Amino acid sequence: MIYAQILAGGKGTRMGNVSMPKQFLPLNGKPIIVHTVEKFILNTRFDKILISSPKEWMNHAEDNIKKYISDDRIVVIEGGEDRNETIMNGIRFVEKTYGLTDDDIIVTHDAVRPFLTHRIIEENIDAALETGAVDTVIEALDTIVESSNHEVITDIPVRDHMYQGQTPQSFNMKKVFNHYQNLTPEKKQILTDACKICLLAGDDVKLVKGEIFNIKITTPYDLKVANAIIQERIAND
């Protein structure tokens, strides 16, 4: 089976003094998360669409989805303490509720990236079915500088080899779950990216080309940019 998981477990502290997590903030009259989920319900290949939410915001998430979207594939579940635990909670939910096979894949995506395209979703599904681990990326536009002590430059990697990670990130569910279970508690604490889990296990991670407008709405400035993108699209329709 093919699952989508919308990662809406964060609290959005970088958004500043707001009354709710950033995924529920309005974007052109609808919550950001609704714009994102709308992209996924258009794809008929998904058997279920999981929305991972903070426990205290699950009812709010369900109410928002029901207000704007009618699709019985959608299930709101509890997120985890961090990004990777949220993904693993999704896999645990699937295993307990529907059962898990060797071929099941999951397409995980940030709730606050509402501008992903049908192409990106399709290529993630195809690549995950083929390789078992996928990251969506764009070429790095700026030179990347590394500093191990946060004071002086320790390395400047070749920009042609650098990419900026986006989402979706997609995985064979059994594989990534087993890799995660094999990590030490210390590794689990420091790893913030699920693709790194697969890399550490020796798996190849396929690259899917993202889009520069597939932005993550994290700060008030990002929200202004997102509104500008929508207004431009409305004007061009």
Swiss-Prot record:
Keywords: Cell wall biogenesis/degradation, Nucleotidyltransferase, Teichoic acid biosynthesis, Transferase. Its EC number is 2.7.7.40. CDD domains: CDP-ME_synthetase. One of its GO terms (biological process) is cell wall organization. It holds the Pfam family IspD. The record marks 159, 216 as: Positions ribitol 5-phosphate for the nucleophilic attack. Pathway: Cell wall biogenesis; poly(ribitol phosphate) teichoic acid biosynthesis. The record marks 14, 22 as: Transition state stabilizer. One of its GO terms (molecular function) is D-ribitol-5-phosphate cytidylyltransferase activity. Belongs to the IspD/TarI cytidylyltransferase family. TarI subfamily. Catalyzes the transfer of the cytidylyl group of CTP to D-ribitol 5-phosphate. This is Ribitol-5-phosphate cytidylyltransferase. It comes from Listeria monocytogenes serotype 4b (strain F2365).
